[in-house]
Amino acid sequence: MSSNDSTAKEQSFLFNVNKIFLVIHLLMLFMFSSLGVDLMAGVSLISICFYFLAFSLTKSEKLSIYVYSVAVEILLYMILAVVCLGIQCNFQLFLIDAMFFLFSMDYVVLRKKKKNHVAILLCCVYAIALIILYMLDGFYAPLYKLDSVVIKSISIAMISGVVFLIITCMMCLLHFMSSEEGAMEKQAQFDALTELPNRFYMMAKLKNLFEAEKQGEYFLAMIDIDDFKKINDSF
């Protein structure tokens, strides 16, 4: 797979990821507006504008800017949600999702750098934020008071959303890994100069014939006709 094809694939992947985050924030806006949580409704509007603008980032060459910007946005958004409605609503659990997101993106998009220092640092920040939020629970009152039934409903919705995002993230990662494995297998089975299949590819295709009980008098002869002494060193 060429570098341009790989970059286009990564950009398409992040474009779809951005659509998922945009839909989630639209749902958050609807929920907060319905509950009268004006502060988070305003923050949701800002986040929605950010994700609309982020579509242009997914088409750029600097995809790391998009990944780390989203990571920071999730951190700030969920901390504010906990401050507004309390830890019982489970908004903080999305910080765990963000860790999956960071390391998945680090493999899929940022793997060329072969370093994940920023991802590790941000995950440490997420962990510290989680610990602080749980430690401060009970020492402050949420900015908005909600009925216990509403809180429980939000909590269930947030847990469901977290599980959905983790499953989606892992499925996307597995799909990408399978795609990369297929590309590597194809690269290993075909000669780079002639683009002809090699003996391993042929043997895999003819394996059923060789193992058949009624093979008959069929035989296979493979001859390597490459004269590497005459191949230019530029190859």
Regions found by a protein language model. Give the residues of each.
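Hydrophobic transmembrane alpha-helices
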Residues: H25, F50-Y51, S56-L57, V70-F100, ...
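Juxtamembrane or sensor-core-proximal signal-transducing alpha helices
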Residues: M158-E185
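Conserved nucleotide-binding and Mg2+-coordinating catalytic segments in signaling enzymes
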Residues: E185-A204, I223-F235
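N-terminal juxtamembrane segment and adjoining first transmembrane helix
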Residues: M1-S69, C169-L173
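Alpha-helical transmembrane segments of polytopic membrane proteins
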Residues: V43-L45, K152-S160
